[in-house]
């Protein structure tokens, strides 16, 4: 065969015209089949991508339960979030997994309680060092980085073909090796190890130290920008650009605004509007109101871009907060407490879910849910298999969203073996909390005191029923202790140098 010469067909030697036409006749359908196969693969992939829901998760920092028009505020103006509530489901009893940021954020990303993760305080704060008085307990050591071994919701979605972006606050680590790009996100814009931006206007430089005894940590949230640029707007610019770029593939947008965390900084024009507006009984800070309005405009821009691109019907929007609002800045009335403690004002948060074609517009839900639930819920929304060994403390709230059944869960739990330290009114001291039905029990580790409240009758937690209802108190206390043992939480220890006198 290697010695055969090539002979031109014109010489009449070799394949005759009939044979050649026959072979070409066989060859053409083969080409057609290959082209058809390629088209089917391409279209199949496109249809598969087209069939997947996009997920937009908007997390606001330190937004209180009543900081929105749809949650009762007559001072703060939030027309875009209010519209979102009218188009979806609004939850009255939604909870953050902690009264401070890092633990709640870790719970959202992993589906696990902060106590189980051992991420129980705002990284890297050691609250006891901020308190000048002697303390009866040595606060528990907690992890300063979300372990890479945890399979985050971003990693699970990535395995399913999603492209994902973390925009804004991260704050579940101290070391760079644990930033969003190492936890499943394809894009990280402005996420680092700090809990606030230092500045809301470019340049976004910041410096912080835990106490005067500690050296300053300095950072720059976003090195590039233009003078006068406002961080909430910049993150929104990045978010809509991400949506535009990935409009033809399924995406997960984790839009985690630094607002409305301190420092209080907002656009002068919006501040001026609220300075002219009569304050209400509970809300009266013009700068904070202006920050909330900028967040609301951000939501409006994201929704508008989805509408413009024809993505509204295939995009879920989840809107919530990581804990209650700052007690020196906003009011949580009728709730007791604020960010930094475990009364309702510190942990009850706004939650709105818009899921076109599934969630009935203007629907309400009073069933207690918590931030560990987002992981399994998003998987269920996306039609993906649950990962119960990962999101062990979460429950899918899809049955609630569809209004076809309740979720099976005995209770919600919180664990905080630390001290908040200075800065927040009524700052938490080491404690654990359980809510079961309408009942809520708080156990304080310093003096073993138990507080019992019926939230249905006493939303403001003004009447402690522990002494008058010992059986209910002990029932919940037993459950709380059993959960702590199962979750293997870390506990504070007695301070051997403490003298109660």
Q: Which residues make up each language-model segment?
A:
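A long, amphipathic alpha-helix that forms part
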Residues: 236-246, 272-314
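Long, internal low-complexity/basic segments
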Residues: 11, 15-26, 49-53, 60, ...
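A short beta-strand-to-alpha-helix junction
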Residues: 73-78, 95-100, 126, 140-151, ...
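Short, structured active-site-proximal loop/turn typified by the sulfatase FGly-forming signature C/S-X-P-X-R
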Residues: 74-106, 111-116, 163-165, 186-192
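C-terminal cap/loop subdomain of S1 sulfatases and analogous C-terminal strand-loop tails that border
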Residues: 186-187, 191-197, 325-330, 337-344, ...
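Histidine-centered active-site microenvironments of extracellular/periplasmic hydrolases
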Residues: 76, 176-184, 262-268, 304-358, ...
